[in-house]
Structures are given as structure tokens and as C-alpha cells.
């Protein structure tokens, strides 16, 4: 008989006392359920003084925003914990610290990050963290290189691909990124004023052909252990610090997907800034986002290449020039997946505050149309955008 049961606040406190690695566990007395996502319960465990000391996260057996009509495997909690532990092995400074996890209860205890802020919220408020893009690039380079064929033995990699097979969560990504936005589906969510743009996307055969190629690569390219959902809402930042959280979508997939999703979320903020700030602040913020995406790719690519030169285990993959050739394909994948993120976050199920929090209706629609137009451009032109400078030029041309 399964030990699984949905935690109450009292259950979360007791669990944190046992597994929170707190010197004075009985000091933990209350729990606040703070989960704002679709898949989990998240409790902040506080002491008598009201200070948050540790986080308890439990997977629910269904999609929270839909209900029990959309069931989900609880094994995703194991995959999330093990993904974070693996990523933490290679990049501890930028991965949330997992203190304990229990696969049967689908629960994880992790460090409290109350001294950090969610990066998306800070971007929407116009607060700039100049080191964040480079730190995210370091996280991506370290975690993706060390779980790839460049570093892992073929036997270890194949075993890991099996261990991290995550079909139900991948199905969500496959549907929300590559299928739903291009068909009439009940999960789609968009302003009726955008219907002409939505219909144009559905009828764009060249776009749908390019999206089919992106989906096929997502389905078939087990290049590294991805975070799988690395957007600005799954990243905590503080001055000089950054940590990735929420890795339940982890699986072995195309490296460009994680990189492209990260780039796409910076560009969602770029598209939303005219509606989030006055003209001068919006213009300055947009230049910051372009600087961020430049730093993100340049730092990631240089770091990944350096790791390949230093640590590649396979003698064939160590052939001079191969890592750079491989990285060029990662880049083109990333540009395409970046475009997919722009489109699906605008008209699909899961939106972002960078666009949806814009108060003025007409300005919000203009920013959403920009995101759709830019997303389409990037998907269609990915194979012809050869460098980060080319990408930035395309972004400027698009508005």
C-alpha cells in the first residue's frame, strides 16, 4: 500500500523537523502554502519568530490548475530531486540545495531562498541584476556539458537517459510548445483581439514545417540532462547570486532547448517592456535585455567549449573542431526554441507576467503581437541566424 498522501501544513512542519537539517528542529512551528505553479504544493516552514527556514515541496497527482481530470505521475518528484542533485553536483553555486527527498511520498525538502527574489518578478519591476545572465550561462554550461556524451561514458549516459525518462511531463511540453498554439485547442488562452494573428499562425505552412522539425528534435535528441523548464520564473536571484529551482521537467533532450527557453524568457520581457515602463525606462530596459542575451550566449558557448577542450572523455568527440561544430547546431536549435517560447507564452495555456500584467489593453495587445511576430521570425530564420550578433540584429529589425 502506498504511503502517499497529500500533505497538510502540519504534515509539512513535521516532515521539515525530521529532514530539514535544522539545528533546532522543534523551533519549526508553522507552514504557509505558497505554491503558485500548476503541479505542486510548496510550503514555507517557519520558526516561532516567523522566519522561513526551509521549503517542503510535494508533487500532486494531477495538474493543479485543471484538477483531477488531468492526472500526472508522481515519479516526476523523484526526477526533479535527482535532476537538481545531479545539477548541483556540477554547479552547486547556481542550483537550489536539495536536503532530502522521498520518491514514494513525492516530497522534497530544500533550502530556503527567502533572501532571493524570483527573477521574472524583478524583471517586470525593472530591477536589473547585471551578473544574472552570466551566472545562468555558467549553470547551463556546467550542467549540460557534464551530462552529455562529451563527458559521460556511453554506458553511463544510456543508463541515465533511461533513469530520467519523463514521458508525462515531456508530453506537456510537446503539446504546449509545438502542437496547441498551431491548432484550435481548448487549452489555448489568448485575447480575442489577437484572433487574426492566431489564425495566421495556424495557416502558415512554412512555420508549421519548421515547428515540426523543432518538435522532432525535442523528441529524439537525448543530448544532455536538461532542466526542461528554465524560465525566469524558475530562477531565484539576489545581488551577485542566482539559483535554479523547479526541475520536474528534467529529461535527456536537446541542449538548445534549455538555452532557447532561457533566451526566450529574456525576450518576452523585451517585448513587454513598452507596456511595463515609460518610454525612457523601456528603451533602457530593452538594451539591458539585449545585453543579457548576448552575455548569456557568449558566456555559455565559451564556457561549454572550454569544458569540451579540457574534459572531453571520448577520443572521437575530442577531434579538433568538432565541439565548435556541435555548438553551432545547438545555437540554431536554441534560436528556434526561443521563438517557440515566445509564441506559446503569448497564446497558449501558460502565460507570463511580462505580458499579462500590462494594464493598458491596447499596449498589452501590441506587446503580445510583437512577441508573436518575433517568435515566428526566429523559428523561420533560425538556420540563417549564424551568431548572437545576427540574432540581436533580427530582434532590432522586428521592432
Swiss-Prot record:
Binding-site residues, substrate: 229, 344
Cell division keyword on record: no
E.C. designation(s): 2.7.1.100
Pathway assigned to this chain's UniProt record: Amino-acid biosynthesis; L-methionine biosynthesis via salvage pathway; S-methyl-5-thio-alpha-D-ribose 1-phosphate from S-methyl-5'-thioadenosine (hydrolase route): step 2/2
GO BP terms, alphabetized: L-methionine salvage from methylthioadenosine
Binding residues for ATP: 40, 57, 111-113, 246-248
Record SUPFAM superfamilies: Protein kinase-like (PK-like)
Entry superkingdom: Bacteria
Keywords: Amino-acid biosynthesis, ATP-binding, Kinase, Methionine biosynthesis, Nucleotide-binding, Transferase
Pfam family, one: APH
Disulfide bonds: none
GO MF annotations, alphabetized: ATP binding; S-methyl-5-thioribose kinase activity
UniProt record similarity statement: Belongs to the methylthioribose kinase family.
Biological role stated in the UniProt entry: Catalyzes the phosphorylation of methylthioribose into methylthioribose-1-phosphate.
Subunit details: Homodimer.
Protein name: Methylthioribose kinase
Source species of the chain: Yersinia enterocolitica serotype O:8 / biotype 1B (strain NCTC 13174 / 8081)
